[in-house]
Swiss-Prot record:
It comes from Pyrococcus abyssi (strain GE5 / Orsay). PANTHER family: 5-OXOPROLINASE SUBUNIT A, UNCHARACTERIZED PROTEIN YBGL-RELATED. CDD domains: LamB_YcsF_like (cd10787). One of its GO terms (molecular function) is 5-oxoprolinase (ATP-hydrolyzing) activity. It holds the Pfam family LamB_YcsF. It is an enzyme of class 3 (hydrolase). Its EC number is 3.5.2.9. Keywords: ATP-binding, Hydrolase, Nucleotide-binding. This is 5-oxoprolinase subunit A.
Length: 255
């Protein structure tokens, strides 16, 4: 049994520091690096790519809405042309730094409100996928487990990694509970570990109302901006390995 462990990193910018990138990077296998629109800047992007390389962590683009003030967590209505080119632009920006450091891009994981909007809006999902395909059809799209987005991507010829969230609560329909609601973000490492093992070994988890949600697991996300990110990530890695689960990058098993 194999699974990837990912985190959203490189989200500092200018004088503002966010996340525990150096510490978390030691325990993950794939890094989703912000591309400068919802967070990140050229200096941070290159440093994060270099840090990933030093830790043998695979690099992926983490594009979002052009919303630095809102950290990409506010919905924006985009035309298909805008969505397609916004994605292409951001992947290209990260690729420049990856190439400079001798690193290949493994995947693309949309950020925040864009990630969630793609689950609800098929036209948006198709436009984002087209933007990825424009750049490189060999990239892997990281998206919500068992979502329509995954189906669309596969129909369009893009490889997919089904993602689950270690530190987020689920609705009965398999979507994430909005961050503003009580219980949406889980911080207890033991509860998180139990949920992760349930997802990986039992193929699902209990939703916030107690209903069972079936989930396919290729990659597990731990948010780097969680105050307990280091503690949680290291504990998840330890528990998975104790349970006989191999923690490896997506490229090793998504073909």
């Amino acid at each position: 049994m194999r699974v990837d462990l990912n985190s959203d990193l490189g989200e500092s910018f200018g004088r503002y520091k966010l996340g525990l990138d150096e510490e978390v990077m030691r325990y993950i296998t794939s890094a989703n690096i912000a591309c400068g629109w919802h967070a990140g800047d050229p200096i941070v992007m290159r440093r994060t790519v270099k840090l990933a390389k030093e830790n043998n962590v695979q690099v992926g683009a983490h594009p979002g809405y052009p919303d630095l003030m809102g950290f990409g967590r506010r919905y924006m209505k985009l035309t298909p042309e805008e969505a397609r080119n916004y994605i292409l632009y951001q992947i290209g920006a990260l690729y420049a730094f990856a190439k400079a450091e001798g690193v290949e891009l493994q995947h693309v994981k949309p950020h925040g409100a864009l990630y969630n909007a793609m689950v609800k809006e098929e036209e948006l999902a198709r436009a984002v996928i087209e933007g990825i395909l424009d750049f490189d059809k060999n990239l892997i799209l990281v998206t919500l487990s068992n979502s329509r987005v995954a189906e669309i991507a596969e129909e369009m010829g893009l490889k997919v990694a089904h993602e689950v969230f270690a530190d987020r609560a689920y609705n009965p329909d398999g979507t994430l509970v909005p961050r503003g609601k009580p219980g949406a973000v889980i911080e207890d490492k033991e509860e998180i570990a139990e949920r992760v093992i349930s997802m990986v070994k039992d193929g699902g988890v209990r939703a916030i109302n107690g209903e069972w949600v079936e989930l396919r697991v290729d990659t597990i996300c731990v948010h780097g901006d969680n105050p307990k990110a280091l503690e949680i990530t290291s504990h998840i890695r330890k528990i998975l390995e104790e349970e006989g689960v191999k923690v490896v990058p997506l490229k090793d098993f998504i073909g």
